[in-house]
Amino acid sequence: MVASPFEEPPLDCPRCPRLVGFRHELQGLHADWKNAPVRSFGRLDARLLIVGLAPGMRGANRTGRPFTGDYAGDLLYSTLLKFGFAQGTYRADPNDGLHLVDCRIANAVRCLPPENKPLPVEFTACRPFLQAELAVMSNLRVLVALGKGAHDQILRALTVRPAGAYPFVHNRLHKLPTGLLLADSYHCSRYNTNTGRLTTEMFHQVFEGVRRSLEA
């Protein structure tokens, strides 16, 4: 079990053998990378929690800060700055001085999975960390799921039943039985933007709705 009230996974977390093996492999190849479970970014008293699927290889797995160092972070942090959820300058570096405002960023799986695809057993092993995080965020009002994988894991972490009553739909805002709001967005990956599944305008619309919900 995860220690109470909330602790991030240790840097040598042993829960998922496949992810541990991949981590050790990358530690040998890239000794200057973080190559460890990526801890959440932002304050626990935030009203907004953004949940991604897992760290990116050359992003958070390299830098140690969620969505920092790859294209997904470029789009996410520029959007957070635009809508007042961040202050400072994003330079794709965890030492850039950027800080979040009333916002926190986490991942459903804290370690980098091969091919960016966590296995069901890995979601299950890591879920207690997200559950404990949610439990101590007493001011939380809105969650943003970046992708269907994150959406599904949020519902599981909150034990929302039936999950099928809350389907993943881009820019849909769900009111959950817990009273929390869940906003869905396609993941801000380069693949999704290159293929046209997600545009900058579409992503901004999600956070415009989030801001409106928090100010209501």
Residue ranges, per PLM feature:
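A polyanion-binding, active-site-adjacent surface
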Residues: 2-215
